[in-house]
Amino acid sequence: MMHKPLFAAALALLPLAAQAQTAALPTDPAADWSVATSEHRIAVEGGKVWVRVNGVIGQGETPVILIHGGPGGTHLGFGTLLSLADQRPVILYDQLDSGMSDHPGDPANWKPARFVAELEAIRKALGVERWHVIGHSWGSALALEYAAAYPEHTASAVLSGTFLSTSHWITGTNLLIRDLPDDVAATIRACEGPTPPAIEVCEPATAAFYDAYNGRPDRPAPTSVMLAYRQRYGGKGFNPELYNTMWGPTEFRASGSLAGYDVSGLLARVDGAKVMFVIGQYDEARIDTVQDFLALTPGAELAVVPGGSHAFIAERPEVAEAIFRDWMNRKDAAAPGH
């Protein structure tokens, strides 16, 4: 799932299920995409969400909306993907109770179905007929739920850093812990036990797990533009109460409302040719788990970002943007009437 907001994006390509050709980089890589064409506050169940658009709806190629992780994260992790707006409108938003959106703080709103309905409310308010939905981590589950519920409005669905099943995720996490050095793995297990050691003992072991699988230490440092953007548009930032209520206090076990969550069965209900899975080479979303999901989705594709973890969008920004750009261009070209 997600712990720290990620600001940048990533691109490195190692397709497994199908060949994906690397697309050209943006025509103007120096452009300041941090300036939105328009900003909106859109009414949804429970309050209003903040939405920004780069580009003009109805102009260019099919729009794309980017769905952040968490639960409780923000749009900041998609910063460099705004360069996709040289071809199509790019829509970013903060889910209710996160970032720049309203924070009613009502747990009654913290249900997957409401988050999916939130997406549809945004689509209607912006006047979008069809769009690509790219969801990362928790956002990938929302992207799949949306694509299954609204196929007529979904040009494609990208399930990035794929999370579709809590039980699969926890199983994968336990296997990843086993791959850490023995002393680190033993400390994490002790910290998750009935009588955990002091926090000073647990924090370094948890950090070692995150460095390996959730945000590798060699990722690029945020630029001054990114830091300025975060200061201006970070809002209230990550919402730990929302995360803890839906997931739990640690990455290693789910004790919240998502404990029994599993939407992998929806893969059989969507058009596999419109689905792509994307993960990092060292992703917390393990490749064998995602290959199982791929097998349930005939016609879907899988791309792996070399050197990337769950935060591959921040770690390999140039490779990730090309993956998403090429995918959407190919799906647009294959669409009837294009």
Predicted region positions:
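Conserved loop-alpha-helix segment in the C-terminal half of the alpha/beta-hydrolase fold
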Residues: 260, 264-307
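Alpha/beta-hydrolase
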Residues: 186-268, 272-276
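Catalytic active-site module of serine/aspartate enzymes centered on a nucleophile-bearing elbow/loop
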Residues: 299-338
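Active-site loop/oxyanion-hole signature of alpha/beta-hydrolase fold enzymes
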Residues: 95-138
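Flexible "cap/lid" loop of the alpha/beta hydrolase fold
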Residues: 157-200
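N-terminal cap/lid segment of alpha/beta-hydrolase-fold proteins
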Residues: 27-48
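Conserved hydrolase catalytic core segment
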Residues: 129-175
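Conserved HGGG/HGGXW glycine-rich cap/lid loop of the alpha/beta-hydrolase fold
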Residues: 46-103
